[in-house]
Amino acid sequence: MGSLSVVDLDLDEVKRGLTDGSMLLVDVREPHEFTAGHIPRSVSHPLSTFDPAALPTAEGQRIVFSCAAGIRSVRAIALAQEAGLALREHYRGGFKDWVAAGEPVA
């Protein structure tokens, strides 16, 4: 495999992508974490059972990974790239950054 390609997105970029519908935010935290609270409009796809072939898709939306603080989301990028997918974006601050900024939680 070649070198890992990662693009860090910040809170404003994630909010913009969710608002304009251009982004599908894939939360790779565990189900109990997702159930306890998640970013509105994000979808759950836990890293513990991560299957790049089973990633959700939405017409016209790019996949961006998110986790608690930007560690597991980078691992998800690595797994996706190892599977041949050209996915490289993640929310660097993750759910902790979202909550700290006072954003709404689902």
Task: Show where each model-derived region lies.
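Short, surface-exposed ligand- or partner-binding patches at beta-edge/loop junctions that are enriched
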Residues: S66
